[in-house]
Amino acid sequence: MTQLRQAKYRQDYQAPDYTITEIFLDFDLDPAKTKVTAISKVKRLNPQSSTLELFGEDLTLISLEVDGKAWTNYKEESGKLIIESLPEAFTLSIVNEISPEKNSALEGLYVSGEALCTQCEAEGFRHITYYQDRPDVLARYTTKITADKSRYPYLLSNGNRIAEGELDDGRHWVKWEDPFPKPSYLFALVAGDFDVLRDEFVTRTGRKVALELFVDKGNLDRAPWAMKSLQNAMKWDEERFGLEYDLDIYMIVAVDFFNMGAMENKGLNVFNSKYVLAKSETATDKDYLNIESVIGHEYFHNWTGNRITCRDWFQLSLKEGLTVFRDQEFSSDLGSRSVNRINNVKVMRAAQFAEDASPMAHPIRPEKVIEMNNFYTLTVYEKGSEVIRMIHTLLGEEMFQAGIQLYVHRHDGSAATCDDFVQAMEDASNVDLSLFRRWYSQSGTPVLTVRDEYSPEKQQYTLHVSQMTPPTADQAEKQPLHIPLDIELYGEDGAVIPLKRDGSLVNSVLNVTQASQNFVFDHVTSRPVPSLLREFSAPVKLDYPYTDAQLAFLMQHASNEFSRWDAAQQLINNYAKINVEKLHKGEALVLPEHVVDAFRAVLLSDNIDPALAALILTLPSENEIAELFTVIDPVAIHNAIDFIHSTLANEMHDEFLTVYRSIKIDGYRVDHGDIALRSLRNTCLQYLAAADDRELANKLVEAQYRSADNMTDSLAALTAANEAGLPCHAELMSDFDDRWHHDGLVMDKWFTLQGTNPAKNTLEKVRELLNHRSFSMTNPNRVRALVGSFTAGNPVNFHAEDSSGYQFLYEILVDLNTRNPQVASRLIEPLIRFKRYDAKRQDLMREVLEKLKGLENLSGDLFEKITKALES
């Protein structure tokens, strides 16, 4: 295991001494023992070298030949096969064996249900055969697969199917050819028996592309939405980005056992079934929108990731940040831009900001990595996307698209860097991004402090803006960044005040580039109310001393819907902080009438999108509130939020009931109007369930559950009963279990409710459910739903002072450490942030981390996080 302990540094990048230009892979498939033959055309790049280093893990080497002759000049050491005394160009033939059924880590070739499938990103290909498993080695792949026809009637790989045949022994074979050079992480193979949904897409140049969606037998009725989403994504990428699909066929396979969400393998995407399967009885509105987003994300990788890939894994955000931006734009263009923006920002504030403040803090382009799987993070993906969005804000759509076209023209068919992308944007737009580049190298969440002054005599309004990024675990020193600050000013009547300076109109996006700057605006006839950081124009924390009255004003008058929501969030945040302090002092909790009135006005407004109203009325999560504090008190935060929730529920009870009863929706459709109405109606139900009138709450919730004709409404009722601990809760949960226990994806929703239940006996219940008929520790979706929801989504119970939550996670991690290190590494996150808590909890969590560190075969995934946490 020693090779897993060695850190790699971005600055140490060296091009390979040799590269592989073509590879022929021949698989003789069997779950117990699969024979892999790899025949590669290799050529020297470094004239000084005659040694080829290949990576290989858990492989049995059978034979090795160079130009058709047995080659003995090689050695195996620490996960590498080092072949020496090689000529300038040669054909390398390697035969090895692997055992897919023993592969519980789900990296490389493994068993998922009755099928065989692969996951090769980041470094999974080395679990299939010996290879230069690095993203800057791009080869053309031809793949032949042979297997038992009755067991595996479908044999799939990248590219186009070029030949197939049958053998006398009941087996058959298929040969695939991918004409586009690609790195090994984009290789894919799937073998199994599926139901197939077939359709086509005609590109803008008139080419017909066959579309095939493979799902488990019996799930065909849950595939049409994913197919529609794929066609929408292909059309959108042509219209918005001018990018057209390049193969004759595009395939998606849904599998139940998958560590990630989905994988963009060239022409053959492998998806977690969670992001493919949907029908109204089993999937919620959120599921439908997530499927649309993830289908889009993986398709968009065809250009931003596959045709242009990463030079090395430190550049991961080059493909992921850009592609997340693209999938967010896709969802925004097809649905509600403001709702999508708000949901993206909620992830940033609740989870990415927490990552910045953790021992695993890193820039979007990391400098140092031990286990690459640990850097598929919210920072690389979500913050990476915010960095791309800032470039879009600074350049505008037209220049941004010119930059994309230049980037594609320069780098198509190659492995590029983040610097290459920024350079293309700069060259296409003539906008200086030299200071902006610091976003790629500097970690942490900047704090933007804004103060203002108004001069009635001069009719001038001045914003004093300063920026500061607190030190992070990986960087002590911080420098000023280029921060686009989008603002708007309002007069007392709610009208927008034009931004003017020296007689000219000023752009609403202010360029904050120094540690402190002043921005002066003329012809401002009265003191304005500023709307700051509109659209969340930069991934920063804002410090401006808004009064309650100003926030209520913005909730009503801000022209930007995100800003209306953000004002409501800040108002609640203020009282969450006030009430946590009051709890510490033993004082009575408060939520003034004017705050309730501000929220009542939103609920009763006739000119607001119901989806926006629902989001404004939805309180920040306990994890979001936690980010407001230096030292997190999970019990006080829970009680403060609970108080605010129940106060609004009781004070606005009649209004919630009126709106709840007034919303009628005929049938189930996936369109923004209906989704918006359902979300507002179900938000009202959550509040009604939390009110003092328990009898009415129980009646309403049970009635909705019993009459629901779709999973969105059914689950909303169950969630309301779960959070409020209503009398009907146990019976409804039992009914749901009886109805859906055979369906893993639906049961994940039920397991998540069990894990997030605020009741004091939740951990006891979670432990019992580890033996539930629908639960399996071998399935990452089940583990995330039950265990992950408790450890990451139920802070008041996970952080119980008796350490029971920490001990539970310890036991789970010991199990997963060898079974599936990637899933273990995700689950450990709440523990490694122990320094955010009080001294007692810190000691208890540190104790668990020390015990884990002492495990005999601690995986590299866990070792890296535990070590960083204990050393921070």
Which residues does each PLM region occupy?
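N-terminal, polar/Ser/Thr-rich
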Residues: 1-35, 110-119, 126, 131, ...
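Hydrophobic alpha-helical and helix-loop surface patches within well-folded domains
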Residues: 176, 204-458, 462-465
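Long, ordered, helix-rich scaffold segments
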Residues: 350, 377, 522-872
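Beta-strand-rich binding/interaction modules
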Residues: 60-67, 432-435, 445-532, 649, ...
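Extended, low-hydrophobicity, Ser/Thr/Pro/Gly-biased non-transmembrane segments
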Residues: 95-198, 561-564
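A surface-exposed beta-strand-loop module
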Residues: 45-112, 133, 169-170, 174, ...
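Surface-exposed beta-strand/loop patches in extracellular or lumenal glycoproteins
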Residues: 39-58, 130-133, 139-148, 419, ...
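Short acidic/polar inter-strand loop motif in beta-rich domains
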Residues: 98-105, 470-471, 536-541
